[in-house]
């Protein structure tokens, strides 16, 4: 019996454990909506939209810009800008430590990435919030990058598109972060005066100071399916008004029904749909592939 254990069973267990450890991490992903277990390479083909239930999963800012902009001619804007802890703010942690941790986790300097490029051959400027960086909160660098992107759109007289995913203003920057609401709104007013289109795409989630400023100031406001959009969260509102909120409250479908946004577009259709829309705005020839 002892020989059988040593010669057969133990080597078999060791081989099995070795095979388990050789499976790459992150190869499978569970849908947070329907809990289907999905093969990661196949999920990437659907742009992180569940093929079983059509749930639009959160994606990072660079991935979003990669799938939206043409491959050629991209130029990142404001990449040299880095956040500074001017107030020496501290809550349960020092702000500078939170920044360092977020930068290490995401590989980004702050919560907004801006790029000039092309959309099906049409010059555009696009921005995307990185929700994984301190909840996509808007501080001085986010505001400055957005303004620089808008200024490039003004100089080139081309459309500006912003993909919002944010919890709101960054509390660690206090009044400096609140000032970004006015700063971004002011530059969007200049775009409107010049007749340059701004398309705001609301992804899951958009709250607080971002929803109360740039996110809701688009000439066209687009929502991704079932994105949460509001100022305060539904639980906070329920506790305040002490009433049960309507079914689907703050979902993009609810906002569309009540006239707060203009359309809901599936992620896979967003690129050609916006290309057609912007060609109409700018009186450019419609893209052939659209």
UniProtKB/Swiss-Prot annotation:
It comes from Pseudomonas paraeruginosa (strain DSM 24068 / PA7) (Pseudomonas aeruginosa (strain PA7)). Residues 27-290 form the CoA carboxyltransferase N-terminal domain. PANTHER family: ACETYL-COENZYME A CARBOXYLASE CARBOXYL TRANSFERASE SUBUNIT BETA, CHLOROPLASTIC (PTHR42995:SF5). This is Acetyl-coenzyme A carboxylase carboxyl transferase subunit beta. GO terms for biological process: fatty acid biosynthetic process; malonyl-CoA biosynthetic process. Disulfide bonds: none annotated. Belongs to the AccD/PCCB family. GO terms for molecular function: acetyl-CoA carboxylase activity; ATP binding; carboxyl- or carbamoyltransferase activity; zinc ion binding. Acetyl-CoA carboxylase is a heterohexamer composed of biotin carboxyl carrier protein (AccB), biotin carboxylase (AccC) and two subunits each of ACCase subunit alpha (AccA) and ACCase subunit beta (AccD). Gene3D superfamilies: 2-enoyl-CoA Hydratase, Chain A, domain 1. Signal peptide: none annotated. It holds the Pfam family Carboxyl_trans. InterPro entries: AcCoA_carboxyl_beta, Acetyl_CoA_COase_Trfase_b_su, ClpP/crotonase-like_dom_sf, COA_CT_N, Znf-ACC. Binds 1 zinc ion per subunit. Component of the acetyl coenzyme A carboxylase (ACC) complex. Biotin carboxylase (BC) catalyzes the carboxylation of biotin on its carrier protein (BCCP) and then the CO(2) group is transferred by the transcarboxylase to acetyl-CoA to form malonyl-CoA. The keyword Protease does not apply. Zn(2+) binds at residues 31, 34, 50, 53. GO terms for cellular component: acetate CoA-transferase complex. Its cofactor is Zn(2+). The gene is accD. Pathway: Lipid metabolism; malonyl-CoA biosynthesis; malonyl-CoA from acetyl-CoA: step 1/1. It is found in: Cytoplasm. A zinc finger (C4-type) spans 31-53. It catalyses: N(6)-carboxybiotinyl-L-lysyl-[protein] + acetyl-CoA = N(6)-biotinyl-L-lysyl-[protein] + malonyl-CoA. Its main location: cytoplasm. Keywords: ATP-binding, Cytoplasm, Fatty acid biosynthesis, Fatty acid metabolism, Lipid biosynthesis, Lipid metabolism, Metal-binding, Nucleotide-binding, Transferase, Zinc, Zinc-finger. Its EC number is 2.1.3.15.
């Amino acid at each position: 019996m002892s020989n059988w254990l040593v010669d057969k069973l133990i080597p078999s267990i060791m081989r099995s454990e070795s095979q388990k450890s050789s499976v790459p991490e992150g190869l499978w992903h569970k849908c947070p909506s329907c809990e289907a277990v999905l093969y990661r390479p196949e999920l990437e083909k659907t742009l992180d939209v569940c093929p079983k239930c059509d749930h639009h999963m959160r994606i990072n800012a660079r991935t979003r810009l990669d799938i939206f902009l043409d491959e050629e001619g991209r130029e990142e804007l404001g990449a040299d800008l880095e956040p500074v802890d001017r107030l020496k703010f501290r809550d349960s942690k020092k702000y500078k430590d939170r920044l360092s941790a977020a930068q290490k986790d995401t590989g980004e300097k702050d919560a907004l990435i801006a790029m000039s490029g092309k959309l099906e051959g049409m010059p555009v400027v696009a921005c995307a919030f990185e929700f994984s960086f301190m909840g996509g909160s808007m501080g001085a660098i986010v505001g400055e990058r957005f303004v620089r992107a808008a200024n490039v759109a003004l100089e080139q007289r081309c459309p500006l598109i912003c993909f919002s995913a944010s919890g709101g203003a960054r509390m660690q920057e206090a009044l400096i972060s609140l000032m970004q609401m006015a700063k971004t709104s002011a530059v969007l007013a200049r775009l409107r005066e010049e007749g340059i289109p701004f398309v705001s795409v609301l992804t899951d989630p958009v709250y607080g100071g971002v929803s109360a400023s740039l996110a809701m100031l688009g000439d066209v406001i687009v929502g991704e399916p079932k994105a949460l959009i509001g100022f305060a969260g539904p639980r906070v509102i329920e506790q305040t008004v002490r009433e049960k909120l309507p079914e689907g409250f703050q979902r993009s479908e609810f906002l569309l029904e009540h006239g707060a946004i203009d359309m809901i577009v599936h992620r896979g259709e967003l690129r050609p749909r916006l290309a057609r829309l912007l060609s109409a705005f700018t009186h450019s020839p419609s893209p052939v592939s659209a």
